């Protein structure tokens, strides 16, 4: 007989705060969020351990939490963020639980505190809630999957034992994928795989717990690796990542029937291309080594002349660069109108980013956090309140509706400006010889890849 469960719900103020974060994260920061496999997520009330790759710090669990709004999510986070008493209370209210690590926390009482966290996670699962963990036990700075720890399975089986092995606990593999880790107005993707039932393993677990967990761990890791972009050739990682992200990746996607501009389709194309490149590296090491060397030279050339790969596909002339300049001048009044109310969204993170953030994978998290707690309150909430008080509801509503449009306009204008700068560098007289050499090298790389991959 199944144990009757009653999943907790977030209080109203936390639901309101989640809606606000969703406005900032999904409405302003990301251009588009894609979700694939939502039908694989077990219904609320089912004990679920959701596991995923971890590549973008807070954004990984945040985006999942904002998609699974039908349930209370519980996350394990590094214990150092719980040191402040106010933060400790707030984070626990939102479903975060502290995970103490020997390498980062004081050794004493670590085991005892982790047992408390384990008990809280088991209680949440026993109540039919969802617990999300990252088995790599830390974020990666590359698009690859690290070694999985067994902690998530220990929690899952401990919860099953708490329920006397009478109720199923599900492991839900998931993956996070980003078109760009560091920039706003880019796309992100969440994929949910088929859930893995632990009930068929209960009897074996009671006889041989570690062997059973290792077997399941392999299944879970393979499921996540198949969903994500996994580049395991770390020796040539930078070159492979550049090739799939730029002109050759777009060419490959189009030739193989994928949509390069639609992230779920582009991920499939990137997976296919990366597998082909890594296979070619094993089968034709000398040819691929030359291609990777040329790719490194090409990347250095782009950096030297401050240009991007897309310019070689467009090949703009002086006239095209001039037209971009005239377009920027024509749109300048609109940009100024849009940047005045939204400027702090750009300025405040820039002020503190270099001083506070040492790990580049925290950049996106920092930008979202600053927007939620500082920039958006100053740029949006405060003006809306003042307009409502002094000018009336309709002025406040108009500003609220116009604000995201102004932010998107200012962001796209800045993108146009930097593309204009790149086009100018591309056609500058003193750069022409170097650009011609890079163009030849790019063609050589493309031809070399076509001959090896076909």
Spans of model-derived segments:
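Short, contiguous pre-domain boundary segments
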Residues: 1-6
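Short, well-structured alpha-helical interface segments that form or flank functional binding sites
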Residues: 151, 215, 328, 332
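Long, charge-rich alpha-helical interaction segments
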Residues: 211, 218-311
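Membrane-proximal, non-transmembrane alpha-helical segments
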Residues: 275-354
């Amino acid at each position: 007989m199944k144990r009757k469960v009653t999943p907790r719900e977030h209080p109203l103020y936390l639901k309101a705060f989640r809606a606000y974060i969703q406005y900032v994260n999904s409405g302003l920061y990301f251009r588009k969020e894609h979700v694939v496999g939502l039908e694989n997520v077990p219904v609320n009330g089912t004990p679920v351990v959701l596991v995923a790759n971890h590549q973008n710090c807070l954004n990984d669990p945040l985006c999942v939490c904002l998609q699974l709004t039908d349930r209370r999510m519980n996350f394990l986070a590094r214990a150092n963020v719980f040191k402040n008493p106010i933060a400790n209370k707030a984070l626990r209210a939102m479903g975060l639980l502290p995970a103490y690590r020997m390498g980062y926390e004081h050794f004493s009482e670590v085991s005892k505190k982790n047992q408390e966290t384990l008990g809280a996670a088991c209680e949440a699962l026993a109540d039919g809630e969802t617990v999300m963990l990252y088995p790599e036990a830390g974020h990666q700075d590359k698009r690859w999957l690290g070694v999985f720890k067994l902690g998530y399975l220990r929690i899952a089986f401990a919860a099953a034992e708490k329920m006397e092995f009478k109720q199923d606990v599900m492991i839900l593999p998931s993956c996070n994928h980003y078109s760009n880790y560091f920039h706003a107005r880019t796309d992100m993707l969440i994929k949910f795989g088929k859930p893995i039932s632990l009930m068929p393993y209960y009897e074996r677990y009671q006889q041989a717990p570690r062997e059973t967990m290792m077997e399941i761990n392999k299944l879970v890791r393979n499921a996540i690796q198949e969903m994500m972009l996994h580049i395991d050739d770390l020796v040539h990682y930078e070159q492979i990542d550049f090739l799939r992200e730029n002109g050759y990746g777009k060419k490959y996607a189009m030739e193989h029937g994928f949509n390069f501009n639609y992230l779920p389709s582009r991920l499939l194309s990137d997976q296919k291309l990366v597998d082909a490149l890594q296979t070619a590296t094993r089968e034709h090491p000398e040819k691929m080594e030359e291609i990777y060397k040329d790719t490194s030279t090409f990347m250095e050339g782009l950096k030297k002349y401050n240009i991007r790969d897309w310019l070689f596909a467009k090949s703009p002339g002086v006239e095209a660069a001039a037209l971009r300049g005239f377009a920027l001048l024509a749109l300048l009044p609109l940009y100024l109108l849009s940047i005045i109310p939204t400027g702090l969204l750009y300025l405040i993170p820039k002020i503190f980013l270099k001083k506070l953030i040492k790990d580049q994978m925290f950049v996106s998290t920092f930008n979202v956090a600053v927007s939620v707690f500082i920039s958006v309150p100053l740029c949006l909430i405060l003006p809306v309140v003042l307009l409502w008080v002094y000018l009336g509801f309709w002025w406040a509503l108009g500003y609220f509706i116009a604000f995201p449009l102004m932010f998107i306009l200012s962001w796209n204008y800045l993108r146009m400006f930097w593309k204009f700068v790149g086009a100018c560098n591309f056609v500058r007289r003193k750069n022409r010889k170097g650009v011609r050499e890079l163009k030849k090298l790019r063609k050589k790389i493309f031809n070399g890849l076509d001959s090896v991959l076909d």
